[in-house]
């Protein structure tokens, strides 16, 4: 590896532009087809006419962000293939979501997940949860910032902020339907980018066996680690337990994901979309792990990060691309288009979701406007949040390693909300005071461990980064280097302030549940007559149906046979009968 800088050539720019124009063309096409949509509901939910396959691919694409494309391989490169255990958490989280949250949210036909909280608890709980949701603007800022890290390896100037123009154009014209079908194209682009890197690496190394052998020698094949210590960064338990809580928060409570499966034409399509999405997530994770092992195979004797050739581990994969694909004009452009597409998909998802939450939770309850005006306001909100998200990208550069930053944001925001929604759906006796104070306590717990991590970060003995070396570096721009990162030793001191970042969401969620139950028992349990119809599932029913792998919709009276979700939504607004 010479260390000489490579830049994209004309052919790469052409491929980059053509690929993104293809994505834009799909968005514009569906925008044109839906140009006569006359309501804000159609704009924000796609008219509830989307099929399972399209929604499943959109679910995958919306969380296969540029952060995922860049950070997951870097995580495997530094900490090993044990990261692949996250695939188990995908399955557990989707089963939990499909059997607990999906029947309730789909039946209620809500545009905003936080509308449920007012039906089940109180207006104050709904507003606080909405405020927490808007902290996800920081995550969207990370997603916008990530392509800048990649593009700096191949372009002489930052161009990532221009992505917002494409996102906003699709949103302003086509709403959720345009976003979903654009996601379908973009996920194909993302996988094509991954595969171009993996295939070239395998060819250069003479087969996948060489890559696996290098990984084994370097300690990257480290699946046998069942340490229960919660302070360890990655073990089987932190990845499975923390991952299950984290992904349950994403699919069970996070507005962009709920908004997608609620846009399906039937509940069967919605459930199928969730499970097909698991396959997409598994393929994404597998590609990330293999890419990370490829990184180590190429850089095992000369780590570009330690050698100062890149400023962040998240730039390692783009650095490899420019090193091994520079002679294949067009392929580097395809990879950078994949990173860019991943960012576009997630940003468009977030903007559409924030517009939906603002419309349903803040504007509609207070102001009576015509559907035409509501539609215009929805488009205006998309523009506003797009501008704010670009501004948040400036803060993202201060947040350190992107994968850990994303998990911390998810822990602070997602953990307390997962606990609150789980209380609402599964615990009929929890009252409004229990819900509100459970949310506050969960948020306080999540914030406290986050502050603890900032003040007293996890020591190397707990994070256990694997050995990296620069002894094989021979850069033309400087002298030789000889720097080897030693393998970590056993820690001499444990600090409770620094659990694995994957447990932040667990701490926030369990605190919300425990405090919510205690407060409800102390202040008087909620009575059956006080429930809005359709907001609670009996825990016993939920357990039986999940255990038997059958639908939990039989708790309700005919989800598709009594006029559909829309008719049911009107019914429950005038009824306070408990379905349990």
Predicted segments, located by residue:
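Membrane-embedded helix-loop-helix hairpins and adjacent transmembrane boundary segments
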Residues: 1-580
């Amino acid at each position: 590896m010479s260390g000489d800088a490579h830049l994209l050539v004309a052919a790469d720019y052409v491929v980059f532009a053509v690929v993104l124009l293809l994505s834009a063309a799909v968005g514009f096409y569906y925008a044109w087809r839906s140009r006569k949509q006359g309501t804000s509901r159609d704009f924000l939910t796609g008219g509830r006419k989307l099929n399972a396959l399209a929604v499943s691919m959109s679910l995958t694409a919306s969380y296969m962000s540029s952060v995922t494309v860049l950070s997951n391989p870097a995580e495997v490169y530094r900490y090993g293939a044990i990261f692949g255990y996250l695939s188990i958490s995908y399955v557990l989280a989707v089963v939990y979501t499909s059997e607990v949250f999906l029947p309730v949210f789909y039946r209620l036909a809500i545009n905003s997940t936080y509308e449920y909280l007012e039906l089940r608890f109180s207006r104050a709980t709904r507003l606080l949860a909405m405020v927490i949701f808007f902290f996800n603007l920081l995550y969207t800022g990370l997603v916008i910032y990530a392509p800048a890290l990649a593009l700096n390896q191949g372009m002489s100037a930052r161009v990532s902020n221009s992505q917002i123009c494409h996102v906003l154009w699709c949103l302003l014209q086509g709403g959720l339907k345009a976003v979903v079908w654009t996601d379908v194209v973009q996920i194909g682009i993302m996988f094509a980018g991954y595969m171009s890197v993996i295939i070239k690496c395998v060819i250069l190394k003479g087969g996948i066996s060489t890559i696996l052998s290098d990984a084994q020698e370097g300690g990257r094949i480290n699946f046998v680690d069942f340490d229960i210590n919660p302070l360890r960064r990655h073990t089987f338990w932190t990845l499975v337990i923390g991952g299950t809580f984290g992904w349950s928060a994403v699919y069970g409570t996070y507005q962009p994901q709920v908004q997608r499966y609620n846009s399906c034409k039937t509940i069967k399509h919605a459930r199928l979309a969730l499970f097909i999405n698991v396959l997409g997530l598994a393929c994404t994770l597998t590609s990330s792990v293999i890419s990370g092992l490829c990184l180590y195979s190429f850089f095992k004797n000369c780590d570009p990060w330690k050698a100062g050739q890149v400023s962040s581990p998240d730039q390692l994969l783009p650095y490899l691309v420019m090193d091994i694909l520079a002679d294949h004009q067009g392929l580097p452009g395809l990879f950078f288009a994949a990173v860019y597409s991943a960012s576009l998909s997630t940003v468009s998802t977030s903007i559409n979701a924030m517009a939906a939450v603002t419309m349903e939770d803040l504007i509609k309850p207070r102001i009576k406007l015509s559907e035409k005006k509501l539609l215009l306001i929805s488009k205006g909100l998309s523009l506003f949040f797009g501008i704010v998200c670009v501004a948040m990208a400036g803060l993202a550069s201060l947040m350190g390693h992107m994968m850990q930053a994303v998990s911390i944001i998810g822990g602070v925001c997602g953990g307390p909300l997962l606990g609150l929604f789980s209380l609402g759906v599964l615990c009929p006796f929890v009252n409004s005071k229990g819900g509100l104070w459970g949310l506050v306590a969960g948020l306080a717990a999540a914030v406290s461990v986050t502050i603890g991590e900032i003040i007293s970060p996890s020591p190397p003995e707990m994070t256990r980064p694997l050995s990296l070396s620069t002894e094989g570096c021979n850069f033309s721009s400087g002298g030789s280097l000889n720097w080897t990162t030693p393998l970590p030793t056993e820690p001499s001191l444990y600090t409770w302030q620094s659990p694995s970042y994957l447990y932040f969401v667990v701490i926030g969620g369990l605190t919300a549940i425990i405090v919510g139950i205690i407060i409800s028992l102390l202040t008087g349990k909620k009575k059956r007559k006080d429930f809005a119809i359709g907001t609670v599932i009996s825990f016993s029913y939920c357990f039986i149906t999940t255990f038997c792998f059958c639908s939990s919709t039989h708790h309700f009276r005919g989800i598709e046979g009594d006029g559909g979700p829309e008719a049911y939504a009107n019914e429950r607004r005038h009824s306070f009968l408990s379905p349990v």
